[in-house]
């Protein structure tokens, strides 16, 4: 399994880091088989697999549950888990308690924290406590209400300057890596070159040290529409639906199950049970 040191070396040698967001055992297993370097168990699971309207309702228990499944499917891949909404904002003490619970119960290799202001102290405390932290700046879904929706961040001088400063402070606080989401490509590239830690982009252009996308977006599963920054490599929903329709039709027409799918019992045993009736 790659470690923090390996990811730093990959950045230094210009080798792109491949990260994928996955939420369960089958997806994690496929991700590892495909050669993904790092798996993110994102709180986006609330919308993608739980059918919620946002990430706000996702709990620490949800993150532990899904991370356990991912770790079982990808035993040799570095797994990062999101700390969900308000699990690290109320106090430093509660943040440390929640972080410890996630790591101890799920086996996560690192935790991801969104935002800059108000989070730097927590990054430092977790790092000192032995928990690696991945920071997340730009479009931060947990704060989408404050940001005014799902919009590109850092397009003007003031917000771009703030992103640069927050990126520096995340590194100084001890973050092992930084995720930049929905940030202009040129800005993300400049930040990537300035920082010594790996910068992983999602909707942040090709100049970052790595890329992350959501499994369901990549394979075309259960998504009605995809963001501009997504490249879809398959459309698996259609063959899945066709398979299910075939099953429904076969059951209703009594084509399934056939003899090949059934188990046999000696006729004498059956007659003994029912008296030859």
Curated annotation (Swiss-Prot):
Quaternary state and interactors? Homodecamer; pentamer of dimers.
EC number(s) reported in the record: 2.1.2.11
The protein's matches in InterPro entries, at most eight in alphabetical order, are given as: Pantoate_hydroxy_MeTrfase, Pyrv/PenolPyrv_kinase-like_dom, Pyrv_kinase-like_dom_sf
Report the function annotation for this chain.
Catalyzes the reversible reaction in which hydroxymethyl group from 5,10-methylenetetrahydrofolate is transferred onto alpha-ketoisovalerate to form ketopantoate.
* Active site per database record: 181 (proton acceptor)
Pathway participation:
Cofactor biosynthesis; (R)-pantothenate biosynthesis; (R)-pantoate from 3-methyl-2-oxobutanoate: step 1/2
Entries under SUPFAM superfamilies matching the protein: Phosphoenolpyruvate/pyruvate domain
Swiss-Prot/TrEMBL catalytic activity: 3-methyl-2-oxobutanoate + (6R)-5,10-methylene-5,6,7,8-tetrahydrofolate + H2O = 2-dehydropantoate + (6S)-5,6,7,8-tetrahydrofolate
State the gene name recorded for this protein.
panB
The free-text note explaining how the cofactor binds reads: Binds 1 Mg(2+) ion per subunit.
Gene Ontology cellular component annotations, sorted alphabetically: cytoplasm
The residues the record assigns to binding 3-methyl-2-oxobutanoate are 43-44, 82, 112
Task: Name any Gene Ontology BP term.
Answer: pantothenate biosynthetic process
**NCBIfam families from the entry?**
panB, PRK00311.1
Which family is this protein grouped under? Answer: Belongs to the PanB family.
UniProt cross-references to Pfam families, sorted A to Z: Pantoate_transf
Q: Kindly indicate whether the keyword Transferase belongs to this entry.
A: yes
Q: Where does Mg(2+) bind?
A: 43, 82, 114
- Major enzyme class: transferase
This chain belongs to the protein called 3-methyl-2-oxobutanoate hydroxymethyltransferase
Spell out the molecular function terms from Gene Ontology. Answer: 3-methyl-2-oxobutanoate hydroxymethyltransferase activity; magnesium ion binding
- Location(s), subcellular: Cytoplasm
Q: Which organism is it from?
A: Bacillus licheniformis (strain ATCC 14580 / DSM 13 / JCM 2505 / CCUG 7422 / NBRC 12200 / NCIMB 9375 / NCTC 10341 / NRRL NRS-1264 / Gibson 46)
What are the names of the required cofactors?
Mg(2+)
